[in-house]
């Protein structure tokens, strides 16, 4: 089931939290490295949970991870790890928190080599889902196939974030996602 159809199957109170994400963020290209990092962290934290849970905790994640500033997160020490493990506003999973910190360090290295995380993504585009998954598994932590697929669809590197009949699809095309550029 597509995300477009999924939202319409939800109860009205759940639809509201998804509607904003669907209409304004999902599938649109992201040009800022910190926001790309944000999306990666949210997708990693969704593993095994509902996307509704993650969307409801989104602002808590933003606060807990210093607005997803890559340099700050990469510099987290044991006290920061403990702070995150005690923060009821986020997902308190050791592997996911560790992945956020280690992936921030990895992105800093990518930024040194490619100038930005986005440039690294653009450098490797286009790839199939399987090729992307292999690359992400070699580069990052806690990035299985579904996490990589959702991260890349949600940021415009893979198609099918929206059905062609969805009104948002035309807005996505105007935003020129990577998958639509030849």
Model-derived segments and their meaning:
Residues 1-182:
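HhH-family (HhH-GPD) DNA N-glycosylase catalytic core used in base-excision repair
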